[in-house]
Amino acid sequence: AILMVSTTPVLADGHTDTGLTYGPRPAWLISQMDDGALKTRLQACLSQTPTRTDFSIGHRGAPLMFPEHTVESNIAAAQMGAGILECDVTFTKDHELVCRHAQNDLQTTTNILVSDLADTCTKPFTAANGDEDATAECRTSEITLEEYRTLTPKMDAADARAMTAEEYQGGVADYRTTLYST
C-alpha cells in the first residue's frame, strides 16, 4: 500500500519493544563476509535483543527490503527498532499530501509506466537507443490522490537499457531484494 500523510502519531510512537527483530538481512550479510575478527565480532551481535531507539531512523521505511514510503516499509522499520519514521512529503494534482522521496520518481518506484496512468507522465517512456539510455519521468503532481492510490509500489529501480516500459520496471540494485515486493 502506498503511504499518505496523516496527523496521526507514527507507528513507532508509543509501541513497546515486544516483537522487534532485525530480520534476516544482517545475519545474511555477515555470513557473506570473509572469516576474520570483524566477522566473529559481528556474529556475536546476532544474539542481541533489538530495542527501539530514536537513534535508529526508518528513512523512507525499510527500503532495502520493501518499496520505500509504503505502509509495509514503515511497519518493517518500526519492527526492526526504528524509533523515528521519516516521511518526505510531496503533493498530488488535487493538492493532497503523500509520502514520497521526490516529486518526479513514480517511473522508478511504481508501476505507472505499465498502468492506465502512463499517459500522465511528463516524459513518456522512451526506449534505449544505441548509447542513449531509456528514459521516462512521471510526477506525483500530475495525478490525483485517487489515481495515486491505484499505483502499485515497487523497489526503486529502472533498467536503463530497456526497450519496453515493462523491461524498464526491472533493474533492481544488487543490495535490494524483491522478495517482499508484491
Name each model feature, range by range.
Residues P9-T182:
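Phosphate-group recognition and catalysis centered on beta-loop-alpha active-site segments
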Residues A1-S6:
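Bacterial N-terminal signal peptides
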